[in-house]
């Protein structure tokens, strides 16, 4: 039995990974590398405890340097993580976990127990497999998974989650074929966890009526529309949940941005591309009581595959959103509408004084390529166009909007995520108190407000129209994975050069 509470103090930790000092060829060397970062986690837990925190979430890929990963090295770092459905497990107390092969699992279990704190940690999990009976079983006869592990405040493993949609991780991880929510009880209510491109779990949130999500992430920002704090706050607002989003802090790959979000907006967030260090965020969350919806859950087992005629835009080849169809806003006040196919985006607006930069209404209805997946998006946006080119990174905002109403017609699904992003002193920020959102009326700013608008966005993910590229997994790394890694590094280099310019 978990005694309910009226509020709960929680934390997320945005961590800048400490790379290993030497190459990893043994389990001992792998543990040395892991401990460099788990020691920092311990410091964050101690600081959190001093602030009254009852639960902390750590980021995806927070324990190891992604730039040095191979299947062999991940094998050295992986541990077998128990599933709670197979019985009670407390690695801190139980003798079978007092071995080198379970050292990190035991470390985190004891960390949670000794500090009376719930914890969610991302690590490498392993499962043995048989090639004779399991077609997906690699040559090394084991499945390595990108894994979230949740511990309660007594150190028990209360949830385990394997990642389904890999994001250029096929060189070291396997994709889980069993999509399921990992759920556990806390004093504030039931929690769930997932990560990164497994972000379609809004349907499962509604199926299980979960109102609190722990979300470890390694979020690569794609300005100006698909950045971490925009997407995470939009998800929390639409799904009516508390979202604890912890991203790794890796500036060279534009990977950063964490926060604690509620149905009312951001309780606290951190989005600083200019500060190369870790950050602890603490806030209080409240219980959320929402009646379970009656809508039918989308079936993920039967995706709609694109035809050869479909124009699939590759987000990471492009690195921008210039492929949207845009229509410029030319008068101080008015209405602008732009359509693609049968999907139309419409903005009614008024600016203070005059436009000091170019703004436009943009629309997109189609597939976007990301990693091993084609993801179907509908996008309706009002956005600044730096140097008169829309869809590029925005560095400064001087135009203030006195009024904005953004809505769209032709949605293919009701899962529409709203965000309203402003820019103060050249830094992107969230201001949840200046706007409202309803499914019928879209985004509308409140009377008497004037904001330096970065972008207002309505983004729908049409999960039933997603498709897989069917990337083949093998061991050792095959040519396709090498090509993907090269492609990713080219994107990283381009993003770094662009950010520095």
UniProtKB/Swiss-Prot annotation:
Gene Ontology biological-process entries: bioluminescence
Superkingdom of origin organism: Eukaryota
Pfam families in alphabetical order: CN_hydrolase, Vanin_C
Tissue localization of expression: Photogenic gland (at protein level).
Residue numbers bearing the S-(coelenterazin-3a-yl)cysteine modification: 390
Domain CN hydrolase: 20-287
Top class in the EC scheme: hydrolase
Molecular-function GO terms, alphabetical: hydrolase activity
Residues forming the catalytic site: 60, 163, 196
Keywords recorded for this protein, A-Z: Hydrolase, Luminescence, Photoprotein, Potassium, Sodium
Keyword Hydrolase: yes
Gene3D superfamilies in the cross-refs: Carbon-nitrogen hydrolase
Enzyme Commission number(s): 3.5.-.-
Note: On the 2D-gel the determined MW of this protein is: 60 kDa.
Recorded family membership: Belongs to the carbon-nitrogen hydrolase superfamily. BTD/VNN family.
PANTHER family noted in UniProt: BIOTINIDASE-RELATED, CN HYDROLASE DOMAIN-CONTAINING PROTEIN-RELATED
Function: Monovalent ion-dependent bioluminescence photoprotein. Displays an emission peak at 470 nm (blue light). Trace amounts of monovalent ion trigger the intramolecular oxidation of the chromophore, didehydrocoelenterazine, with the emission of light.
Descriptive protein name: Symplectin
Biological source species: Sthenoteuthis oualaniensis
Origin organism lineage: Eukaryota, Metazoa, Spiralia, Lophotrochozoa, Mollusca
Gene behind the chain: sympp
């Amino acid at each position: 039995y978990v005694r309910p509470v009226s509020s709960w103090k929680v934390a997320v930790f945005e961590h800048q990974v400490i790379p290993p000092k030497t190459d990893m060829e043994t389990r001992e060397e792998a543990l040395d590398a892991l401990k460099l970062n788990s020691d920092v986690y311990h410091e964050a837990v101690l600081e959190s405890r001093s602030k009254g925190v009852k639960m902390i979430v750590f980021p995806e890929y927070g324990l190891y340097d992604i730039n040095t990963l191979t299947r062999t090295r991940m094998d050295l770092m992986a541990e077998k993580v128990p599933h709670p459905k197979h019985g009670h497990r407390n690695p801190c107390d139980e003798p079978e976990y007092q071995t080198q092969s379970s050292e990190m699992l035991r470390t985190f279990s004891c960390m949670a127990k000794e500090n009376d704190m719930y914890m969610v940690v991302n690590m490498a999990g392993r499962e043995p497999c048989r090639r004779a009976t399991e077609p997906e079983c690699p040559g090394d006869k084991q499945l390595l998974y990108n894994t979230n592990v949740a511990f309660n405040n007594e150190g028990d493993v209360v949830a385990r989650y394997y990642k389904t949609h890999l994001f250029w991780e096929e060189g070291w991880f396997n994709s889980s074929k069993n999509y399921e929510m990992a759920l556990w009880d806390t004093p504030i209510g039931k929690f769930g966890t997932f990560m990164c491109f497994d972000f379609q779990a809004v349907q499962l949130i509604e199926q299980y009526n979960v109102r609190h999500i722990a979300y470890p992430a390694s979020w690569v920002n794609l300005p100006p529309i698909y950045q971490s704090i925009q997407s995470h706050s939009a998800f929390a607002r639409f799904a009516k949940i508390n979202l604890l989003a912890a991203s790794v802090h890796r500036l060279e790959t534009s990977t950063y941005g964490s926060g604690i979000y509620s149905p009312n907006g951001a309780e606290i967030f951190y989005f600083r591309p200019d500060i190369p260090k870790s950050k602890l965020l603490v806030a209080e969350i409240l219980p959320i009581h929402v009646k379970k919806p009656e809508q039918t859950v989308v079936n993920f087992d039967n995706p709609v595959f694109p035809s050869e005629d479909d124009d699939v835009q590759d987000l990471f080849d492009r690195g921008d959103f210039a492929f949207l169809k845009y229509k410029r806003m030319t008068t101080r006040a008015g209405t602008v509408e732009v359509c693609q196919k049968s999907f139309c985006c419409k903005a009614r607006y008024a600016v203070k004084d005059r436009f000091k930069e170019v703004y436009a209404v943009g629309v997109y209805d189609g597939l976007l390529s990301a990693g091993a997946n084609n993801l179907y998006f509908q996008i309706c946006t009002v956005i600044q166009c730096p140097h008169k080119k829309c869809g590029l990174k925005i560095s400064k905002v001087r135009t203030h909007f006195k009024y904005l109403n953004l809505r769209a017609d032709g949605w293919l699904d009701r899962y529409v995520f709203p965000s309203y992003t402003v820019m103060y002193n050249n830094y992107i920020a969230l201001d949840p108190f200046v706007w409202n959102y309803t499914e019928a009326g879209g985004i509308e700013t409140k009377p008497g407000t004037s904001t330096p608008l970065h972008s207002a966005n309505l983004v729908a993910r049409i999960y039933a129209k997603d498709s897989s590229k069917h990337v083949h997994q093998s061991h050792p790394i095959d040519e396709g994975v090498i090509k993907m890694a090269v492609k990713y590094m080219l994107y990283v280099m381009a993003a770094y050069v662009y950010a520095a310019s």
